[in-house]
Amino acid sequence: LLDIYNRQEQYDKVIATLNRIEGKMGKSEQLSMEKFRIYLQMKDNKNAFHEIESLVAEYPMDTRYQVVLGDVYMQNGKKDEAYGIYRKVLDAEPDNAMAMYSLASYYEATGQKELYQRQLDTLLLNKKVPSETKMNVMRQFVVQNEQDGRDSTRVISLFDRILEQEP
């Protein structure tokens, strides 16, 4: 039923169905994330915020939701709130790759290029960040570097420094 409504872009019915399921089964991460996704598709930022904020309240120790909330704030021009969340997460978990990347994106979006580069280095040169995560970030960095028409020297230098650390 959810798939049918979703394919037909009847998002109000998707939300109503998810709310009925939630009423019967109780609140869950999966349902809240699905409602969040649908609200974003509907461009209903108020309810999208509410869903993520409720997940943060429900699972206060799970920093993923805090970072997602920060990302939603960034996408909606609430940069100070986003920055505060990223700093809070990194103060509690300095090696949180998701928060490191989001903070780097914050610096880039706010025109703080030097801090962006430094934060990206912090993420990519952190031995506790999984190699797969580093590869994904590097892919994005390479694409962005090419789109911006920048010299590839920085990319090569960063690759060399990462490879020195990785077996």
Segments predicted by a language model, with ranges:
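Alpha-solenoid helical repeat scaffolds
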Residues: 1-167
